[in-house]
Amino acid sequence: MPQLTTSRVPVGFVEATVPANGITLNYVRGGTGPTLVLLHGYPQTWYMWRKVLPAMAEHFTVIAPDLRGAGGSDAPTGGYTKSSLAEDIYDLLAGLGLADQVSVVGHDIGTMVAYAYAAAHRDSTSRLVLIEAPLADETLYQLPSLTPQGPGLWNFGFFTLQNGLPERMLAGREDTWVDGFVDWLEVVKGGVDEQAIAEYAAQLRQPGHTRASFDYFRAMHADVAETIHHRDTPLTIPVLAIGAEGTLGQMVHDQVVNYANNVTGDIAPTGHWVAEEDPVYLTARLLDFLADDHASPGAQNAMATA
């Protein structure tokens, strides 16, 4: 079994915890400049951003938290609606004095949290990036579990089972589970390396974390109602919607335009795990999008010449 190394945190970053919304959240922080928050997905942690963190920290104060129920954060038995997870992040930023004018980037489950954050904190959210996940609306009920090309998004239904079967299936098999789940959606093989597999499996072995990882999905019925509520008041901030050519593709953009008026779409040359499969692509795309009017003049000039 791959072992975790002691050099998980990139140079220039620190890992810490902070009270937020009644729990304790773990996060890494680095860089200076406007606030940029990176929100991970399932079954990952902040570690999924490790390959893009150094470049982003040259221009931003970067905060990459572990969501409630993941990594080094607490895993209580409730609070997994995406609006609740978004308030966790807002409280974390407020506690650090970083909640004013924030750019938010989400991947997978983090996409749903990022949208909920922007919808709830419109005056203090500058830009939004949504990567490789549908928003939690009626679209979820139309996703096929089986397609002519093979398995569809079967996991959305399986993970919502309330009888403990998903937890029992994973118990003692976390490394095998993460490795197989990642491989299913990975196009650039090895992008999610052995160290990352070990990281994500280890966090699932922490008390309550496997249950919490499925609670993200079990909360989606409530999320659907909350998301639909926001549809009549679309976001006006710039939004970048990224799908991957090996997985969701154009679907991400085509759904997000129903919730925001200023949407740019892009297709990553990867599978689902964009930040790990092609960090060069994602870093360049993020810097280009976030540079337009969000960063300080000095940072904008630096990015323009990078």
Residue ranges of model-derived segments:
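A short, glycine- and basic residue-enriched loop/turn
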Residues: 45-46, 112, 271
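Flexible "cap/lid" subdomain of the alpha/beta-hydrolase fold that forms the substrate-access gate
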Residues: 2-17, 22-25, 32-35, 55, ...
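A short, charged, Gly/Pro-tolerant segment at domain boundaries
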Residues: 301-306
